[in-house]
Amino acid sequence: MNIIKTEIPEVLIFEPRVFGDARGFFFESFSSKVFNEAVGRQVEFVQDNHSQSQKGVLRGLHYQLDPHAQGKLVRCVEGEVFDVAVDIRRSSPTFGKWVGAVLSAENKRQLWIPEGFAHGFMALSDTVQFVYKATNYYAPQSERSIIWNDPEIGIDWPALGDCALSLSEKNLQAHTLANAELYK
């Protein structure tokens, strides 16, 4: 497993070693030992989620507050997405900064988004199957959202002019970073 550091030290890209031949391919998609060594702490995942989206669907920027904060290990198993993590920890030197990565069925990369970050993605291909592990259960009372196009954050979403953007009503009503309930 190749661990790729991003501009925000806590957010990591996991790139598996893929072994292929005429029959297909094999790779180890998750190893608790490798993962915990890379993130520098013991992490326990309690829930796996799976979503399907069409091109232009933008989901996010979502997070859960304490005591239900979630870390997520995300990957795209069909198609391609642009995946984003935004640091929303007020005490962090990277507060308000974002990192993005293209995750696809082809590159098989995964992105680790720790607790204290908002997460979102945009579907870049006609069909996307997106799966992720979460460190805490879904808790609607702790769920919050930040608007996807907040100018203070300035996410450079790719291909915005290439397709019709599709967002949920909840995502359209999300707060700006300045007005959101955040981590300390």
Locations of regions flagged by a protein language model:
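Conserved metal-binding segment of the jelly-roll/cupin
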Residues: 103-125
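Non-catalytic, conserved peripheral segments adjacent to functional cores
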Residues: 1-106, 125-127, 132-184
